[in-house]
Amino acid sequence: MAGAAGPEIERLIQLLARLPGLGPRSARRAALHLIKKRDALMAPLASALQVAIDKIEVCSTCGNIDSQNPCTVCTDPRRDSSIIVVVADVADLWALERASATNGRYHVLGATLSPLDGVGPEDLTIDALVKRAHDPGVAEIILALNATVDGQTTAHYVTDLLQDANVKVTRLAHGVPVGGELDYLDEGTLSAAMRQRTLF
Protein backbone atom coordinates (compact mmCIF):
# COMPACT_ATOMS: atom_id res chain seq x y z
CA MET A 1 0.00 0.00 0.00
CA ALA A 2 1.53 3.28 -1.13
CA GLY A 3 2.11 5.90 1.52
CA ALA A 4 2.04 3.46 4.45
CA ALA A 5 5.56 4.49 5.42
CA GLY A 6 7.16 7.91 5.33
CA PRO A 7 9.73 8.84 2.68
CA GLU A 8 12.66 8.22 5.05
CA ILE A 9 11.53 4.66 5.73
CA GLU A 10 10.82 4.03 2.04
CA ARG A 11 14.35 5.25 1.22
CA LEU A 12 15.78 2.85 3.82
CA ILE A 13 13.79 -0.02 2.29
CA GLN A 14 14.93 0.89 -1.24
CA LEU A 15 18.58 0.95 -0.15
CA LEU A 16 18.31 -2.35 1.73
CA ALA A 17 16.69 -3.94 -1.34
CA ARG A 18 19.90 -3.23 -3.29
CA LEU A 19 21.84 -5.65 -1.07
CA PRO A 20 22.49 -9.11 -2.53
CA GLY A 21 19.87 -11.62 -1.45
CA LEU A 22 17.36 -9.00 -0.30
CA GLY A 23 14.29 -8.38 -2.41
CA PRO A 24 11.62 -5.76 -1.64
CA ARG A 25 9.83 -7.94 0.94
CA SER A 26 13.00 -8.96 2.76
CA ALA A 27 14.20 -5.36 2.71
CA ARG A 28 10.90 -4.22 4.25
CA ARG A 29 11.23 -6.84 7.02
CA ALA A 30 14.86 -5.85 7.63
CA ALA A 31 13.91 -2.17 7.83
CA LEU A 32 11.14 -2.90 10.33
CA HIS A 33 13.53 -4.98 12.42
CA LEU A 34 16.13 -2.20 12.41
CA ILE A 35 13.55 0.38 13.41
CA LYS A 36 12.25 -1.80 16.25
CA LYS A 37 15.83 -2.34 17.47
CA ARG A 38 16.90 1.26 16.95
CA ASP A 39 19.28 1.52 19.93
CA ALA A 40 20.48 -2.09 20.00
CA LEU A 41 21.02 -2.55 16.25
CA MET A 42 20.26 0.43 14.01
CA ALA A 43 22.54 2.96 15.76
CA PRO A 44 25.54 0.57 16.00
CA LEU A 45 25.00 -0.45 12.35
CA ALA A 46 24.93 3.18 11.24
CA SER A 47 28.11 3.82 13.23
CA ALA A 48 29.84 0.76 11.76
CA LEU A 49 28.85 1.84 8.24
CA GLN A 50 30.30 5.32 8.85
CA VAL A 51 33.56 3.82 10.14
CA ALA A 52 33.70 1.60 7.04
CA ILE A 53 33.20 4.64 4.80
CA ASP A 54 35.97 6.53 6.60
CA LYS A 55 38.52 3.76 7.21
CA ILE A 56 38.15 0.88 4.74
CA GLU A 57 40.24 1.00 1.58
CA VAL A 58 41.46 -1.28 -1.17
CA CYS A 59 44.98 -2.66 -0.75
CA SER A 60 47.21 -1.22 -3.47
CA THR A 61 49.25 -4.44 -3.54
CA CYS A 62 46.71 -7.27 -3.66
CA GLY A 63 43.23 -5.74 -3.91
CA ASN A 64 41.99 -6.95 -0.51
CA ILE A 65 39.87 -4.55 1.53
CA ASP A 66 41.15 -3.56 4.95
CA SER A 67 41.53 -0.64 7.31
CA GLN A 68 45.17 -0.23 6.30
CA ASN A 69 47.06 -0.06 3.00
CA PRO A 70 48.92 -2.30 2.30
CA CYS A 71 46.56 -4.72 4.02
CA THR A 72 47.33 -6.91 7.03
CA VAL A 73 47.85 -9.97 4.79
CA CYS A 74 50.44 -8.20 2.63
CA THR A 75 52.31 -6.78 5.63
CA ASP A 76 52.31 -9.99 7.71
CA PRO A 77 55.96 -11.17 7.85
CA ARG A 78 54.81 -14.73 8.63
CA ARG A 79 53.24 -15.03 5.18
CA ASP A 80 55.07 -16.89 2.41
CA SER A 81 55.77 -14.13 -0.10
CA SER A 82 56.92 -16.67 -2.72
CA ILE A 83 53.29 -17.77 -3.24
CA ILE A 84 50.56 -15.61 -4.76
CA VAL A 85 47.03 -17.00 -4.64
CA VAL A 86 44.88 -15.47 -7.37
CA VAL A 87 41.18 -15.05 -6.56
CA ALA A 88 38.34 -13.38 -8.44
CA ASP A 89 36.81 -11.55 -5.50
CA VAL A 90 37.54 -10.49 -1.92
CA ALA A 91 34.85 -12.94 -0.76
CA ASP A 92 37.00 -15.77 -2.18
CA LEU A 93 40.04 -14.46 -0.29
CA TRP A 94 38.02 -14.40 2.93
CA ALA A 95 36.79 -17.97 2.31
CA LEU A 96 40.37 -19.22 1.91
CA GLU A 97 41.41 -17.36 5.05
CA ARG A 98 38.53 -18.87 7.07
CA ALA A 99 39.67 -22.31 5.93
CA SER A 100 43.34 -21.51 6.72
CA ALA A 101 43.96 -22.97 3.27
CA THR A 102 47.15 -21.07 2.46
CA ASN A 103 49.96 -19.12 4.06
CA GLY A 104 50.73 -17.28 0.84
CA ARG A 105 49.81 -13.81 -0.27
CA TYR A 106 46.87 -12.94 -2.53
CA HIS A 107 45.94 -11.13 -5.70
CA VAL A 108 42.30 -10.13 -6.25
CA LEU A 109 41.37 -9.83 -9.93
CA GLY A 110 38.07 -8.08 -9.21
CA ALA A 111 36.00 -10.52 -11.30
CA THR A 112 36.47 -13.18 -13.96
CA LEU A 113 36.50 -12.69 -17.71
CA SER A 114 32.92 -12.78 -18.95
CA PRO A 115 32.26 -11.67 -22.53
CA LEU A 116 28.50 -12.09 -22.00
CA ASP A 117 28.63 -9.60 -19.11
CA GLY A 118 31.03 -7.27 -20.90
CA VAL A 119 33.96 -8.02 -18.56
CA GLY A 120 37.24 -8.05 -20.46
CA PRO A 121 40.92 -8.20 -19.45
CA GLU A 122 41.06 -4.42 -19.08
CA ASP A 123 38.43 -4.63 -16.32
CA LEU A 124 40.58 -6.94 -14.18
CA THR A 125 43.90 -6.38 -12.37
CA ILE A 126 45.71 -8.87 -14.61
CA ASP A 127 48.51 -6.44 -15.57
CA ALA A 128 49.36 -5.90 -11.90
CA LEU A 129 49.40 -9.68 -11.37
CA VAL A 130 51.80 -10.21 -14.27
CA LYS A 131 54.07 -7.51 -12.83
CA ARG A 132 53.99 -9.17 -9.38
CA ALA A 133 54.71 -12.57 -10.95
CA HIS A 134 57.98 -11.18 -12.33
CA ASP A 135 59.22 -10.21 -8.84
CA PRO A 136 62.34 -12.32 -8.11
CA GLY A 137 60.95 -13.71 -4.84
CA VAL A 138 57.77 -15.14 -6.38
CA ALA A 139 57.97 -18.88 -7.13
CA GLU A 140 54.34 -19.99 -7.53
CA ILE A 141 51.04 -18.56 -8.69
CA ILE A 142 48.01 -20.54 -7.48
CA LEU A 143 44.88 -19.91 -9.53
CA ALA A 144 42.05 -20.23 -7.00
CA LEU A 145 39.26 -19.39 -9.44
CA ASN A 146 35.78 -20.88 -9.61
CA ALA A 147 35.27 -24.01 -11.70
CA THR A 148 32.89 -22.15 -14.00
CA VAL A 149 33.31 -21.40 -17.70
CA ASP A 150 34.30 -17.81 -16.85
CA GLY A 151 36.69 -18.98 -14.13
CA GLN A 152 38.38 -21.50 -16.41
CA THR A 153 38.59 -18.96 -19.26
CA THR A 154 40.26 -16.51 -16.89
CA ALA A 155 42.67 -19.19 -15.64
CA HIS A 156 43.75 -20.05 -19.20
CA TYR A 157 44.13 -16.38 -20.11
CA VAL A 158 46.25 -15.62 -17.04
CA THR A 159 48.36 -18.76 -17.57
CA ASP A 160 49.16 -17.66 -21.13
CA LEU A 161 50.28 -14.24 -19.89
CA LEU A 162 52.54 -15.82 -17.26
CA GLN A 163 54.45 -18.02 -19.72
CA ASP A 164 57.56 -15.83 -19.64
CA ALA A 165 57.55 -15.37 -15.86
CA ASN A 166 59.84 -17.75 -14.00
CA VAL A 167 57.03 -19.13 -11.81
CA LYS A 168 55.13 -22.36 -11.38
CA VAL A 169 51.43 -21.87 -12.19
CA THR A 170 49.03 -24.24 -10.44
CA ARG A 171 45.28 -24.33 -9.91
CA LEU A 172 42.98 -25.73 -7.29
CA ALA A 173 41.93 -29.35 -7.68
CA HIS A 174 38.30 -29.97 -8.56
CA GLY A 175 36.25 -32.99 -7.69
CA VAL A 176 34.33 -34.82 -5.02
CA PRO A 177 33.90 -32.75 -1.84
CA VAL A 178 34.59 -34.29 1.56
CA GLY A 179 31.38 -35.97 2.65
CA GLY A 180 29.95 -35.86 -0.88
CA GLU A 181 27.95 -38.73 -2.31
CA LEU A 182 28.55 -39.60 -5.96
CA ASP A 183 24.85 -39.92 -6.70
CA TYR A 184 24.29 -36.24 -5.84
CA LEU A 185 27.19 -34.79 -7.84
CA ASP A 186 26.81 -33.30 -11.29
CA GLU A 187 28.47 -34.89 -14.30
CA GLY A 188 31.09 -32.14 -14.66
CA THR A 189 32.28 -32.59 -11.08
CA LEU A 190 32.44 -36.37 -11.47
CA SER A 191 34.38 -36.08 -14.74
CA ALA A 192 36.86 -33.63 -13.20
CA ALA A 193 37.30 -35.88 -10.16
CA MET A 194 37.99 -38.90 -12.37
CA ARG A 195 40.53 -37.02 -14.51
CA GLN A 196 42.34 -35.59 -11.46
CA ARG A 197 42.40 -38.79 -9.41
CA THR A 198 45.43 -39.37 -7.15
CA LEU A 199 47.25 -42.37 -5.68
CA PHE A 200 45.73 -43.74 -2.49
UniProtKB/Swiss-Prot annotation:
Classification via InterPro entries: DNA_Rcmb_RecR (IPR000093), Rcmb_RecR (IPR023627), Rcmb_RecR_Znf (IPR015967), TOPRIM_dom (IPR006171), TOPRIM_RecR (IPR034137)
MF-aspect GO terms: DNA binding; zinc ion binding
Q: Which PROSITE patterns match?
A: RECR, TOPRIM
Could you list this entry's UniProt keywords, alphabetically sorted.
DNA damage, DNA recombination, DNA repair, Metal-binding, Zinc, Zinc-finger
Q: Which domain of life is it from?
A: Bacteria
- Where in the sequence is the signal peptide annotated? none
Residue limits of the Toprim domain? 82-177
Q: C4-type zinc fingers: which residues?
A: 59-74
Q: GO:BP terms for this protein?
A: DNA recombination; DNA repair
Family to which this protein belongs = Belongs to the RecR family.
**Classification via HAMAP family:** RecR (MF_00017)
What function does the entry list?
A: May play a role in DNA repair. It seems to be involved in an RecBC-independent recombinational process of DNA repair. It may act with RecF and RecO.
Name listed for the protein in its UniProt record: Recombination protein RecR
Q: Which organism is it from?
A: Rhodopseudomonas palustris (strain TIE-1)
Encoding gene, per UniProt annotation: recR
